[in-house]
Amino acid sequence: MTNSTDRPVSVSSWRTYRRLVAFAKPYRLLLVAALIAALIEAAGTTGFLALMKPITDETFIYKNAEVSRWLPVQIILLFVVRGIAGYITDMAMGKSARSIARDLRIKVMAKYLRLPGSRFDSEPVPSMLIRLGSDSDQVAQAAVDAIKVMIQQSLQVIGALALMLWHSWQVTLTILVLAPVLAWVMDKVARRYRRISHSIQESGAHLLQAADQTLSSHQEVKIYGAQQTEMERYGALADRNLRLAMKVESTRGISTATVQMIGAIGLSALLFVAGAQALAGRLTAGDFVVLMTSMLTIIPGLKQLTNVQNMVQRGLASAERLFSVLDSPDEPDQGAVALTRAKGLIEFRDVTARYPGQVNPALADVSFIAQPGTVTAIVGRSGSGKSSLIKLIPRFYDAEAGQILLDGQPVQAYALADLRRQIALVGQQVMLFDGSIAENVAFGEMRSADASQLERAILGANAMEFVAQLPEGLQSHVGAKGGRLSGGQRQRLAIARAMLKDAPILILDEATAALDNESERLVQDALHKLMPDRTTLVIAHRLSTIEHADQVLVMDQGRIVERGTHHELLAQGGLYSHLHGMQFRERQA
């Protein structure tokens, strides 16, 4: 069925930054406000450092009483302004960054719903949840915390350096000799964080997938005594995640120690050159204190800038994972033929279909016609291609060769939304959402249905007998995946949903395979009310349920090997007769 590069880190980062900037455009006023406030905050820090000269010279050396009176007031005012600016920075950055993450999350979710069915075969749902959950949060965290720290600390470092240049350019230039070494260290740290971040996120997705599989199948795990096996598998994945996390910690530790060592060398150079300047009479005690406090402000700022690289690179790696989804091609949808309500004539002409990466086709040269208002049953052993055939009609997948026609037109000629509007589906695994019964029946485009339409559908599906007994009736919540209801009750709600849709084509995918006799009787009765005047395709496990079908297609290894009515196929004594005989003997036993 049709349907980690080694790019240079700097190029990849720049492309990702540019795309994130596009998402930031709606919030540019907030970001400008955050930048202005950050400038004021940095200016406050620089102003405080500048006050070190009059504090030292005027207060302690020249004993100037007037300065001692106005300096405390000035410091208080300075920090009030700085605090207000910091609050504005935090709020503006937080609002814009969280909004960007929300927009990304919504766009990725919408994109997943437009992707072809093959994507859901190749990417497990836990991986999708990682992208929608933690990846989006990582982008927000990088934008809120990391970018905020980078802006604030960068401005403070620049302000402190400017102040140092003003007081002694000779001392400052001596220290700036170390800048290329520091830049090299930070670049190496960023590259390493970037590589590890990708691996950690993939490792986290594998951990979540393993936990989802084990916990979802907890009954089988307990029955077969597989707890130890599953824990060993999960433990191995957790160990790999730990090793990657320790690489991050190792990188952080080494980079922090290196930055501190460079800072210590710079501080030593400052003391040496400043001492020489003071002996020559070119540097006062106040100048020295300003240089010293500025240097002591720069060192932790550089340390924070180095440490925050991990957060930034995690955010960029997460953004790339999200963008890879957004860049995936949508389901092909170029249909232009108008379709309000189909007659329901379905024709397969020499259809061959193959799943991606598979050598053998799922379907091979399949041809048949389903007339409007008739019932076509599709039977065969497990893996014979029954479900694959059904998935081609609503174009969850596209055929590799041949044609599928609806009312004489290839299904590709219709817009996907119009085509799928003609189809109602009742499967073996009914998916109900965590909401009320009414919300689950009047689902999607049917949410505008009135109460009388909803009640008729519920009654027709034989569901009112249990709905009426619930405390809140139609407004009763069904729980996650319909967990508060039995299998038969969920199935009848699915039939009510199909009745309310009133589509001309009905697909029943083993709708009664997992039900007990009483539930099956109620569901079969509801289906008999639903099927008239529709083109119905039934995948049947219990052959006794399709004895009155207008035609039966018997499939084996992706091909139709027999076709005819129930009685005609029994008389032929072929595969259908064999399958029917096996089921009859099982019932007798």
Swiss-Prot record:
Membrane topology according to the record: Multi-pass membrane protein
Keyword match Membrane: yes
Residues making up the signal peptide according to the UniProt record: none
Name listed for the protein in its UniProt record: ATP-dependent lipid A-core flippase
Record-listed E.C. numbers: 7.5.2.6
Domain ABC transmembrane type-1: residue ranges: 32-314
Domain notes: In MsbA the ATP-binding domain (NBD) and the transmembrane domain (TMD) are fused.
EC class (word): translocase
Annotated ranges, domain ABC transporter: 346-582
Source taxon at top rank: Bacteria
Organism, as annotated: Xanthomonas oryzae pv. oryzae (strain KACC10331 / KXO85)
Name of the coding gene: msbA
Keywords: ATP-binding, Cell inner membrane, Cell membrane, Lipid transport, Membrane, Nucleotide-binding, Translocase, Transmembrane, Transmembrane helix, Transport
SMART domains reported for this sequence: AAA (SM00382)
Binding of ATP, residues: 380-387
One Pfam family linked to the record: ABC_tran
Keyword Cell membrane: yes
Subcellular location: Cell inner membrane
Subunit structure: Homodimer.
SUPFAM superfamilies: ABC transporter transmembrane region, P-loop containing nucleoside triphosphate hydrolases
Segments passing through the bilayer: 29-49, 70-90, 157-177, 261-281, 283-303
Family membership noted in the UniProt record: Belongs to the ABC transporter superfamily. Lipid exporter (TC 3.A.1.106) family.
